[in-house]
């Protein structure tokens, strides 16, 4: 009697054979992947022969040098040794070429390379694909559509709203400060800049500074997302969306995104309800000034269609973040720079008091009559650029002015922090010297890039500069800014330049 091929006595042998085949296939796939990684590494090394860099680990790259919160200090060391460019190995097969030279910056910013798929992609769950993340024709369409929201006629009345927001913050400080105590200013400044963007861009009635319960959770979410995105870029195990979603950091990021979206969704829904009552565009225009959100809601794409709900929220999320967090960074570091350089602070105060007279307010007409204060603002942004770096993926080969070249497919990081601290570009770069920005002084067109440059420069740079001037002017006529020697800020690179230990200042009320 024959034994069936499916009988129990045959199963162990069959299973063993299947396991052997599976193991062999797994080993083969592993060898193929290893060969692929080896070949890619060799290609990267050949492509970077013209770009020397410090020694790096075969698997971890430069990760030991770029520990969390130590990146800026490392960049300063590299700029000294490699003043034009330096490859930064994130892992054994992942590298970004950091650029520190204005000629190199000019070449890249004059091209149309897309934003880097790596770090910028990690921001997408938060701010969506709005003006910051879009590339190519969609970016061009959105940029052209949003430009009217930053026209002179729209920006001019915003100054009064900026004044209101700054005065609320200063009134609060007047109640809080005592002669010997110090204040962590970044959180209050963040609330103030959020208040400003809510009033100017979204016509918010009231003040988020006075009723800050919802706004505090939004600001906390933005702070968390800044840290989480930055950490994810540098964690080779978190490059996978699936792995990241399952990690504690991924779950925290998801919750922070939800909080941020709840804030922006609430703003959009309130405006849509208001516009349903107000009617068509011309009726609205006759009643009140149009703001950023009006421009978005009434805008038409080239095919005649309105923005989708997804595109609308992406633009609101983008502008809400960029319009308050980068400006808060700028204001905070400017205050710190002035606090540590009292002679320049005193000269700014004299200029502002001479301009405003007995009136403590500031108007649109005053903004171009503060040359020395503007020089100090720019010098502070050179030392502490609000956005420390931006990245591009090369869509075609590039050759730099010194003859060195990179092939298509490389990611380049334009280190604005490195550029602004490059001794080949700025002599004695760590010295605070507003004279560098004396009107008419000569410098490279791409030596100073606090708002990026080229076609993709910051669309809201004039709005931001106006807000910086208003905040500095009104603060200096009410307070003397003094440093807290026990808590010196430690600049740290995130999406926006922050301090690892906050920005603590002593405020002395002026009589």
Swiss-Prot record:
Residues 1-4 form a propeptide. Induction: P450 can be induced to high levels in liver and other tissues by various foreign compounds, including drugs, pesticides, and carcinogens. The keyword Transmembrane applies. One of its GO terms (molecular function) is alkane 1-monooxygenase activity. It is an enzyme of class 1 (oxidoreductase). One of its GO terms (biological process) is lauric acid metabolic process. It is found in: Endoplasmic reticulum membrane; Microsome membrane. Keywords: Endoplasmic reticulum, Heme, Iron, Membrane, Metal-binding, Microsome, Monooxygenase, NADP, Oxidoreductase, Transmembrane, Transmembrane helix. It comes from the Eukaryota. Belongs to the cytochrome P450 family. This is Cytochrome P450 4A5. The gene is CYP4A5.
């Amino acid at each position: 009697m024959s034994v069936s091929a499916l009988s129990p006595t045959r199963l162990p042998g069959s299973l063993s054979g299947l396991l052997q085949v599976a193991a062999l296939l797994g080993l083969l796939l592993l060898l193929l992947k290893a060969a692929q990684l080896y070949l890619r590494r060799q290609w990267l090394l050949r492509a970077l022969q013209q770009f020397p860099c410090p020694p790096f680990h075969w698997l971890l790259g430069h990760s030991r040098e770029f520990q969390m919160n130590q990146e800026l200090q490392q960049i300063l060391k590299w700029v000294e040794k490699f003043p034009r460019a330096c490859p930064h190995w994130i892992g054994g097969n992942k590298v970004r070429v950091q650029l520190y030279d204005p000629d190199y910056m000019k070449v890249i910013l004059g091209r149309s390379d897309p934003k880097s798929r790596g770090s910028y992609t990690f921001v997408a769950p938060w701010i969506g694909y709005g003006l910051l993340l879009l590339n190519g024709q969609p970016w061009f369409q959105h940029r052209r559509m949003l430009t009217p929201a930053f026209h002179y006629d729209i920006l001019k009345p915003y100054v009064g709203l900026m004044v209101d927001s700054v005065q609320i913050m200063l009134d609060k400080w007047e109640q809080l400060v005592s002669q010997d105590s110090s204040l962590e200013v970044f959180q209050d400044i963040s609330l103030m800049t959020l208040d400003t963007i809510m009033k100017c861009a979204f016509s918010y009635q009231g003040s988020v500074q006075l009723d800050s319960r919802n706004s505090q959770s939004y600001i906390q979410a933005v702070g968390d997302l800044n840290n989480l995105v930055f950490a994810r870029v540098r964690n080779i195990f978190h490059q996978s969306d699936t792995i990241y979603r399952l990690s504690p950091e991924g779950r925290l990021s998801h919750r922070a995104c939800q909080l941020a979206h709840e804030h922006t969704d609430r703003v959009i829904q309130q405006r849509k309800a208001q516009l349903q009552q107000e009617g068509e565009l011309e009726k609205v225009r006759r009643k009140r000034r149009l703001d950023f959100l009006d421009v978005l809601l009434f805008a038409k794409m080239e095919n005649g269609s309105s923005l989708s709900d997804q595109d609308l929220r992406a633009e609101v999320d983008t502008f809400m973040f960029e319009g308050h967090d980068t400006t808060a960074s700028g204001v905070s570091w400017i205050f710190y720079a002035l606090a540590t350089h009292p002679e320049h602070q005193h000269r700014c105060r004299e200029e502002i008091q001479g301009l405003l007279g007995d009136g403590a307010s500031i108007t649109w007409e005053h903004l171009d009559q503060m040359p020395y204060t503007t020089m100090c603002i720019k010098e502070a942004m050179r030392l502490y650029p609000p956005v420390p770096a931006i990245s591009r993926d090369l869509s075609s080969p590039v050759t730099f002015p010194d003859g060195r070249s990179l092939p298509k497919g490389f990611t380049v990081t334009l280190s604005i922090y490195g550029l602004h601290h490059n001794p080949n570009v700025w002599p004695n770069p760590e010295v605070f010297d507003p004279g560098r920005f004396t009107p008419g002084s000569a410098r490279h067109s791409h030596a100073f890039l606090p708002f990026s440059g080229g076609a993709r420069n910051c669309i809201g740079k004039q709005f931001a500069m106006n807000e910086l001037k208003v905040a500095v002017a009104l603060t200096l006529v009410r307070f003397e800014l003094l440093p807290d020697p026990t808590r010196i800020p430690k600049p740290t690179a995130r999406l926006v330049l922050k301090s690892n230990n906050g920005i603590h200042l002593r405020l002395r009320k002026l009589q």
